[in-house]
Design a protein with these regions (language model features):
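A short beta-strand motif characteristic of beta-propeller blades
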Residues: 1-4, 41-48, 83-89, 123-129
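Short, structured loop/turn "capping" segments at alpha-beta junctions
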Residues: 29-31, 40-43, 52, 77, ...
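Beta-rich, blade/repeat-based domains predominating
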Residues: 5-25, 30, 48-64, 68-73, ...
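A short loop-to-beta-strand structural motif that recurs across blades of beta-propeller domains
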Residues: 32-35, 74-76, 115-117, 156-158
Length: 163
């Protein structure tokens, strides 16, 4: 089946919770994150500020929703109620993808600057890779402990082993 999100203009990043709830960013106006239940009911989860061209969406280990903006370097964690719990900051802006690993570390890709920021719990962000052309959405390979990064303009994938 398919689900229409009323008012959406560019659904982009997607995160899915254990119960099957989907959170999808709308990067263009109106800048929103939608919630779509496992039954297919769509509603607006976050609308407007602090979103600034929201893109990547991930679910953390506590079931909270993590969203990154292209328009700034904010890495925002929202409770399922919609409450903004925390804002962290990637090293660079222009962020496209985000993942959260088992230990709570967040990895953020900057499509604008071609870098990967790592944010360990309670620590400042640090760049762990740079010079990645069009570092877009990312995914985590838990078997190999590595990040896979699509390099859109190069029609290639970057693979970043983690320590």
């Amino acid at each position: 089946f398919s689900v229409a999100a009323a008012g959406a203009s560019m659904l982009n990043g997607i995160g899915v919770t254990e119960d099957g709830t989907i959170y999808a960013s709308n990067t263009r106006d109106p800048q929103r994150v939608y919630r779509i239940t496992a039954d297919g009911d769509a509603s607006v989860f976050i609308d407007g500020s602090p979103l600034m061209a929201p893109n990547g969406v991930a679910i953390d280990n506590d079931g909270n929703i993590v969203v990154v903006n292209i328009g700034n370097n904010h890495v925002m964690t929202f409770a399922p109620s919609g409450e903004l719990l925390q804002t962290e900051y990637a090293v660079e802006a222009g962020n496209d993808g985000v993942i959260v690993t088992e230990d709570g570390t967040k990895y953020v890709s900057s499509v604008r600057f071609g870098s990967i920021s790592r944010i360990r719990p309670g620590e400042e962000a640090e760049v762990i890779a740079q010079g990645i052309p069009s570092a877009a959405s990312i995914c985590y390979d838990s078997v190999q402990n590595q990040i896979i990064i699509p390099m859109n303009n190069n029609n290639a994938l970057g693979i970043l082993p983690l320590d």
